[in-house]
């Protein structure tokens, strides 16, 4: 009986996780905060600081894998919780 109950708990936890989607901020640095629901299997939120001359812009969104820092970037922040890229 304990084995059956444990099996049901494990199956329930696995099934509940299958439908989970991540929510990330997707606004640029000077625009109002907006969010997006990430596509299936896109579990990461990112925040990139981009240098554009003397101006620094921040870009946010969902991603499948964490982006790499490009020559024009200052930093990349990648996380895996809802709205963690503020």
Curated annotation (Swiss-Prot):
Compartments reported by the entry: Secreted
Record key words, sorted: Disulfide bond, G-protein coupled acetylcholine receptor impairing toxin, G-protein coupled receptor impairing toxin, Neurotoxin, Postsynaptic neurotoxin, Secreted, Signal, Toxin
Tissues expressed in: Expressed by the venom gland.
Disulfide bonds: 24-45, 38-62, 66-78, 79-84
Endpoints of the signal sequence: 1-21
Any single Gene Ontology cellular-component annotation: extracellular region
Subunit structure: Homodimer; non-covalently linked.
The protein, known as: Neurotoxin homolog NL1
Organism, scientific name: Naja atra
């Amino acid at each position: 009986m304990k084995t059956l109950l444990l099996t049901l708990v494990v199956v329930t936890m696995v099934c509940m996780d299958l439908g989970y989607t991540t929510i990330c901020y997707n606004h640029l640095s000077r625009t109002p905060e907006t969010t997006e629901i990430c596509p299936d299997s896109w579990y990461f939120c990112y925040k990139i600081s981009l240098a554009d001359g003397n101006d620094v812009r921040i870009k946010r969104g969902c991603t499948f894998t964490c982006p790499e820092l490009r020559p024009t970037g200052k930093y990349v922040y990648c996380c895996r919780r809802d709205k963690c890229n503020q």
